[in-house]
Amino acid sequence: MSYAIVRNEKLTRAEVNGKGTHNDRKAKNHTNKDINPTKTHLNYYIKKNELTYTKEFDKYLKANNLKGHLRSNSIIMCQMIFTSDQTFFDKIGEKETKRYFDECYKFICNYKNLGEKNIISAVVHLDEGVPHMHLMFVP
């Protein structure tokens, strides 16, 4: 029996850009050996960030008229990872896999009024061992 797997990670400003490099596949040499560069073209965005994550955060602050000093260790963003086991994805196929991640995205948009406006990026990776989605949001 398969289960939905969700992991949430709190991130400081210093940690955010490293996540962006990984999620957007900006590095030429990946430290994660599970990434298969021949499959990277299969990755897709449900919501694409226009800028780096820190610049998106700064744009978010300005757009929402949020002011004040943030400490260097302040949590500015969270990353949620949605996945399941490989058997689950093999059984449901490509079309239902896409629907699975679309439904995960919709769930978070509606969860406790988080709203799509707080989501910076949502990217599905199909070039690693098991399909998964990285969803970055401002808490």
Feature locations, PLM:
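N-terminal nicking endonuclease/strand-transfer module with a His-rich metal-binding environment
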Residues: 1-139
